[in-house]
């Protein structure tokens, strides 16, 4: 069973698997994902699909992609 990711655009966060990730804009459709102030990866919207790019092993590509899907759906 996959855990749902919940985006909060007013606080610029996504809650996923019991953790809160801050979302920081880098540019058009490109964001840094931070956990406790430490960058764990990036999310990018490319051709209508969310893509997660981990920076290290703190989070998987699949989990970042789920965070990205929730974020991009919320921001429209």
Predicted regions and their residues:
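Short, isolated positions in well-ordered beta-strands
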Residues: 20-23, 40-41
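Short acidic-hydrophobic surface loop/beta-edge motif
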Residues: 10-16
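Mixed-charge, Lys/Arg-enriched low-complexity segments
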Residues: 1-8, 44-76
